[in-house]
């Protein structure tokens, strides 16, 4: 076989493998709480503090992640801590267009599960 062709194929394969291992995902949080409540979200990923976001009613915010994304969330006097992206758990189950879509409601956090094509309750607010 032509050496140049073999080398080109090798290079192409290496580049595509390297590309897929560095895949970025998007974690989106949509505020669907009652009473126009604001949702406060404070996330950390891979030892970095990503700051605090206030997501107003019927708005969303997205983080681009490739590692675990852990967030403190609160509204009114309700508080919780959730892993909203975990590459082992989520890379295939919620990666619709590489996006983990969360809808935050009064009873808890719903995730769009690609295989079931619907939102499913994953985490309840503590105490609920
Ligand atoms: C939500 O936040 C916005 C902007 O930070 C603020 O103007 C609004 O009053 C807040 N709404 C409630 C219900 O606390």
Model-assigned labels for residue ranges:
Residues 2-63, 72-128:
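Intrinsically disordered, low-complexity segments enriched in small/polar residues
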Residues 67-69:
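Exposed beta-strand face motif in extracellular beta-rich ectodomains
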